[in-house]
Swiss-Prot record:
Annotated Pfam families: NADHdh
Compartment(s) where it occurs, according to its Swiss-Prot or TrEMBL record: Plastid, Chloroplast thylakoid membrane
Species assigned in the record: Helianthus annuus (Common sunflower)
Lineage, highest ranks first: Eukaryota, Viridiplantae, Streptophyta, Embryophyta, Tracheophyta
NCBIfam families with a match to the protein in the record: PRK06076.1-2
Similarity field: Belongs to the complex I subunit 1 family.
Highest taxon above the source species: Eukaryota
Residues passing through the membrane, by range: 26-46, 98-118, 127-147, 253-273, 300-320, 336-356
GO terms, molecular function: oxidoreductase activity, acting on NAD(P)H, quinone or similar compound as acceptor; quinone binding
Record-level GO cellular component terms: chloroplast thylakoid membrane
Protein name: NAD(P)H-quinone oxidoreductase subunit 1, chloroplastic
Entry-linked InterPro entries: NADH_UbQ_OxRdtase_su1/FPO (IPR001694), NADH_UbQ_OxRdtase_su1_CS (IPR018086)
Membrane topology: Multi-pass membrane protein
Keyword Lyase attributed: no
Keyword Signal part of the UniProt annotation: no
């Protein structure tokens, strides 16, 4: 059987076409995976740079300025330095718990990004229990911190892990009650539905105005969950050296460093989604869709505008936790627990009862 030249060329072109299809298929699988990872990484780098610049302004000094333009690559330089440092293990500690702890803390926080809507219908997992899934996942992170403290075989590390667990339990309940109030107002636990419920009434329909008490409780509780000053008792330098991070070095210490900023970004994004209208701008007396001509330019342009609005609100809100770090003194452990159990818990419970009563009366 003789095959002429044209048939050989056709077979070769067909095989090349099949190879290209396989390559494109792999690329389309990898794009949804690496795009959120890249976005989250850039978001964390921006937060670190913002914190250093704002902190420098508050303290009247010059922030980072040599690594990249305006020092924006300083966080990347610090991460590279940690990556090449020696990874030390405690001689008498539990090495398995010591190694698993940072990974649990980071993974549990990363999973929270699944239910955050960055734009109209732009969410990785639009679940009917979105906000409560976030609360359930975020409660896993202190387990990793406790494992790290216990596995270090160090009294300072163990005390830091215990403080992290006690602090998380104390402030998780008021946080959950505030989220439950928002869920009752929106008649849904989906993050997308909560944003759309606020969009119906414009700027004055934001839950910030409908739930001012809940917003304050949520703000304080989220600061405590992120272990930011004045609630950074699990890693208080003057008392516990570095808390549960004392024995860590290299990439494992870097994971804790990244986890703290990931948690801060998640909390700010949920404040934006639950209280600040999410991707909806709604400036009073300014018709935003007509201003940007979203309806005529198509859905892609509207999605880009929604992402920009969500991130702008998030980074503007980040000024509050960054400023409180250099403004308020650290609480004592008894003051922290009293604030959570004796003040925030009754206030959040009363807010939930008021919200439930108003919803029942409006039926």
């Amino acid at each position: 059987m003789i095959i002429d030249t044209t048939e050989v060329q056709a077979i070769n072109s067909f095989s090349r076409l099949e190879s290209l299809k396989e390559v494109y298929g792999i690329i389309w699988v990898l794009i949804p995976i690496f795009t959120p990872v890249l976005g989250i990484t850039i978001g964390v780098l921006v937060i670190v740079w913002l914190e250093r610049e704002i902190s420098a302004g508050i303290q009247q000094r010059i922030g980072p300025e040599y690594a990249g333009p305006l020092g924006i690559l300083q966080a990347l330089a610090d991460g590279t330095k940690l990556l090449f440092k020696e990874n030390l293990l405690p001689s008498r500690g539990d090495t398995r718990l010591f190694s698993i702890g940072p990974s649990i803390a980071v993974i549990s926080i990363l999973l929270s990004y699944l239910v955050i809507p960055f734009g109209y219908r732009l969410v990785l997992a639009d679940l009917s229990i979105g906000v409560f899934l976030w609360i359930a996942i975020s409660s896993i992170a202190p387990v990793g911190l406790l494992m790290s403290g216990y596995g270090s075989n160090n009294k300072y590390s163990f005390l830091g892990g215990l403080r992290a667990a006690a602090q998380s339990i104390s402030y998780e309940i008021p946080l959950t009650l505030c989220v439950l109030s928002i869920s009752l107002l929106s008649n849904s636990s989906s993050t997308v539905d909560i944003v759309e419920a606020q969009s119906k009434y414009g700027f004055w329909g934001w839950n910030l105005w409908r739930q001012p008490i809940g917003f304050l409780v949520f703000l304080i509780s989220s600061l405590a969950e992120c272990e930011r000053l004045p609630f950074d008792l699990p890693e208080a330098e003057e008392e516990l050296v570095a808390g549960y991070q004392t024995e860590y070095s290299g990439i494992k210490f870097g994971l804790f460093y990244v986890a703290s900023y990931l948690n801060l970004l998640v909390s700010s994004l949920f404040v934006t989604v639950l209280y600040l209208g999410g991707w909806n701008l709604s400036i009073p007396y300014i018709p935003v869709p007509e201003l940007f001509d979203i309806t005529k330019r198509g859905r892609v342009f509207g999605t880009i505008i929604g992402i920009f609005i969500t991130l702008a609100k998030t980074y503007l809100f980040l000024f509050i936790p960054i400023a409180t770090r250099w403004t308020l003194p650290r609480l004592r452990m008894d003051q922290l627990l009293n604030l959570g159990w004796k003040f925030l818990l009754p206030i959040s419970l009363g807010n939930l009862l008021l919200t439930t009563s108003s919803q029942l009366l409006s039926l």
